[in-house]
């Protein structure tokens, strides 16, 4: 029963992916603007591609639900059912329209299956074309500038003034190019509106900061942004904020090649291993800074399910170990770790360094009424981060009563701080069949995050703690109709207060 299967695909993609952590403002429901992956301030989000998370929970779109989104402006607004506070953690994943370059991708997948083994090979490549940017061809000067910039493309600005046909009626804002003298200096400047009979020009303007540019934005009562030359003062210092420059974005290429295998040792034991080679070329026009383009990743898992510890009482358990190594130059196509990963590990500064992540767990079931889960994990990045995290959960069901408890405890250290992060929680739920299947639940949730300076051995202002106590009553009138009444109290604690 050996089976070999292959699949592949080629396509032109509409957009690029980004994961963005929103910087929230206390009491501000929005709108919050979503930027591009390369720092673009204004993007068009592709409809239906967004996934919005609040405190690790995915939200639903709609006026009668959690949030709404304006795809054209790339702005998210939250509904009154989700009150935004300074402690809210909002992460948005989305794809946005990328009009810089024509973007294509291809993938190839090969699988070979036997009774006990599976081997797979996957390749993926996503790249920008080199021919067009912002709807116009790159000039020879543009390509030379990109070739010299390497990966430092954020500082590459080029002249954006270009000619267009006088008969082009689709463009409202256009200019004439004239010569003028300021302080004895000769300037060739753009003047609005375009004068018929002269060469017609358009330009993209970039904000270079107050008193750093020669143009300012003005209101001319037309459908479009108009800029006027304002020159410089007597000391030769510019008076404006904008210049006719455009920020060059280099075409990039992302690639991933993986080889993996799965071994079914027996009906309950599985061993999986996968290696990956990534490639990221941030500038296809330049060979400069290409030394860090390739990186390697490795993942190994061993899991044994349904181990019988005691036949009487049906005591069974699952055990497993996992190891993951990610090279410092390894670049993923899209984020594969959950949105709360950095918070779970109390990471404040992301360091580009080889990362080792390991985990071992035991999930024990004592019949149908009691379970106990325990896991220990370690995350290490050379001298930049070392963390050990322990997690445990217990669940007990007694007729109509259910009790669950969870706790996570992290000990971590970086070159600047030590931290201890504990998160205990518990819930008791009681069903009352004689009262129309009413359900009463009492829950407790807390977090204690203690951060201390390594140098001064003092508590840092980023430390925090909170406790939440919640009482809830749910009344199920029918299968489709239910009501919930709850009361909740939260206490927040900050250092030095």
Regions found by a protein language model. Give the residues of each.
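Surface-exposed, low-hydrophobicity segments enriched in Gly/Pro/acidic/Ser residues
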Residues: 1-497
